[in-house]
Each structure stands twice: as structure tokens, then as C-alpha cells.
A protein has these predicted regions:
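Short alpha-helical functional segments enriched in proximate histidine and acidic residues
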Residues: 187
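Catalytic palm active-site di-aspartate
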Residues: 119-123, 165, 169, 190-206
């Protein structure tokens, strides 16, 4: 029975009745109805102002982010929706971000050794996605009945937008973009341009990839989204090419600045430049950076791991 609930499906759900939805989610019908009516009451919004890591450049602007933190029982229901409805979908090949089994490495690999790489960022993607767009995803794209689409929209949106912090939001953001980017996909297919997405990061590569910029910007603008010019990057092969924080060109790699900052972090630990009050957080930050490097290039991560281990042994942080 559980296998049929979680069976891989195409980009369609075709849920027409409340009883079918309740079965797929393994939840009582009355719970879905009652919680959808008061879903907005279960959020605890806050503004996230991340403290810069001690090894980060102090001049970097700290980015504030509004988090629409969902709590139980809504959080539990959203997790069910993600795991049983959204995660099992057969996602289009060009969508990478937020898709189980896909990684940053997989996202950048198709663009390796490209003559030109173009990247665009969608500004404030989650807050700009509307309830109407989410409803259309459930209804038009995934084939749910109007009643079911409305119920699922109430369970997965907050104050008329896609909530940052909900487990369903990345998948729904992917689907919203997929529902509006047909002109982009068609143009890329026609001009033999490789196109991939990582949530709000769009990447294009190929001889004619520069030509897709106007098409992409117009398609996004027509659906209420913006792609700031300052976030547009055109990277020919003779320049340094990078995507979602990874260095490209011949093979995926770590940006030089990232490696340097990580080594600097270990050095500051070794020389006692880190206040005792912040040492645990600092070490976690360095460990996180090394884990990221290990994912991309285990060989380059090994010396950093050893250096950090020796440092921690000597300083006993």
C-alpha cells in the first residue's frame, strides 16, 4: 500500500477528490480540511540576520531574510505533501535545485568547457511567487481538481506568497518556474543552448547563449519576476567561469577566494585569534566549509581536514 502512495509519477498527480488526497497523504480528511482553514495561524515569521563568519570579509553586506517559519501540525502536513506528492515526481532533466538525488556538481557538470556561460538570478523568488501561481501549479500543471488545488494551496502558501522555510517551497518554486519558462525552453532547444536551473539561478551555455538573455528576462517579467542586470553574468571560456559558487572551465572546482578564506580560518584558530566565546561556532563554520570542498574535490579537502584536526588537538577548542 505504501508503495502505491509513493510510486514515482510523471509531472502529474491527477488527484480529483478529498478521499484520494487523504489516502495519498495518509491523513484523515477532516484534518486536512480543518488545518487548511487555519494554516496561516501556524507560522512564526522572523527576520534572519546571519552573523558573518569570523573568517569572512567584514566588508560583505549581510543579507537579511524573512523566514516564514511553519510549526506543527502544519509543518508535519507540509512534510507529508513534499514526501508523498512532490518529491516522487519525475522531474524534468534541467531542474536540479531542491530535487532529491541531484547536487550542485550535477548542476554545473553539463556546462563544463562551454564557450560561453550566461547566468541569471531571479530577485526575491519565494516572496514573489503568488498564491495564484501556486494554485495553477496544483491545478493546471499537476492536474488536481479545483477543490483539491485550493486546499493544497492554502496548506503551502502564507500571506499570498510562497513561504520561506516550508519544506514544500523549493519544489513548488521549481514547478512555478517550469510553468512559465516554456518560451525559454523552446528558444534554448531551437538554438541548441544548454539550460539548467537551481531554484532561482538560471544557467545557459553554448555558442548562442547570449541571445537567450532577452527571451529569459521577458518571460520572467511577464509572470511578475525580475532578473536584476547586476546579477547577470556573461562568462566566455577565456575568463573565469563559475556557477552556484563552483568554478567551472575544465572541471568543477572551488573558487580561489573560498579556499583562501578557509585556510585563513584555520590559521586564525591556530594562532589564537578567535575569541573563546565564539570558538565553537567558528569551528562549525570551518568544518562546514571543508565539507563543501570535500563534496567538490576530496583531494583538496584532505590537507584542510588534517590541518584543522592538528589545530584542534593543539588548542583543544
Amino acid at each position: 500500500m505504501s508503495q502505491s502512495r509513493n510510486k514515482k509519477s510523471a509531472l502529474s498527480l491527477d488527484i480529483k477528490t478529498l478521499s484520494a488526497l487523504a489516502y495519498r497523504l495518509g491523513l484523515p480528511e477532516e484534518v486536512l480540511i480543518s488545518e487548511s482553514r487555519k494554516a496561516g495561524c501556524y507560522y512564526q515569521p522572523f527576520i534572519s540576520i546571519p552573523k558573518p563568519a569570523p573568517f569572512a570579509k567584514r566588508s560583505l553586506k549581510v543579507k537579511k531574510r524573512a523566514i516564514d517559519n511553519p510549526t506543527d501540525p502544519l509543518k508535519f502536513i507540509q512534510n507529508r505533501i513534499y514526501k508523498r506528492l512532490l518529491q516522487p515526481l519525475l522531474w524534468p532533466e534541467h531542474i536540479y535545485g531542491g530535487v532529491k538525488g541531484k547536487s550542485l556538481i550535477m548542476n554545473v557538470t553539463p556546462h563544463l568547457s562551454a564557450n560561453v556561460i550566461v547566468t541569471l538570478d531571479i530577485k526575491s523568488f519565494f516572496p514573489t511567487v503568488t498564491t495564484f501561481q501556486v494554485y495553477n501549479v496544483w491545478s493546471e500543471l499537476l492536474g488536481c481538481s479545483p477543490t483539491i488545488a485550493g486546499l493544497l494551496t492554502r496548506l503551502t502558501t502564507f500571506e499570498r506568497h510562497l513561504p520561506q522555510g516550508a519544506s514544500t517551497s523549493s519544489a513548488l518554486a521549481n514547478l512555478v518556474l517550469y510553468s512559465i519558462d516554456q518560451p525559454i525552453r523552446d528558444y534554448c532547444r531551437e538554438k541548441d543552448i544548454l539550460y539548467t536551473t537551481w531554484i532561482d539561478d538560471l544557467a545557459f551555455s553554448g555558442e548562442q547563449s547570449r541571445r537567450v538573455i532577452n527571451v529569459a528576462v521577458e518571460a520572467l517579467r511577464n509572470s511578475g519576476f525580475a532578473a536584476p542586470h547586476r546579477k547577470l553574468r556573461i562568462m566566455p571560456a577565456h575568463d573565469r567561469q563559475f556557477l552556484t559558487g563552483l568554478l567551472l572551465n575544465r572541471q568543477p572546482g572551488i573558487l580561489r577566494e573560498y579556499m583562501s578564506a578557509t585556510r585563513s580560518g584555520i590559521y586564525k584558530l591556530a594562532t589564537g585569534c578567535v575569541p573563546l566565546s565564539g570558538s565553537k561556532r567558528y569551528v562549525r563554520g570551518v568544518e562546514g566549509r571543508i565539507a563543501y570542498i570535500r563534496m567538490v574535490n576530496p583531494r583538496r579537502a584532505k590537507p584542510l581536514e588534517l590541518s584543522l584536526a592538528y589545530t584542534l588537538e593543539d588548542t583543544r577548542v
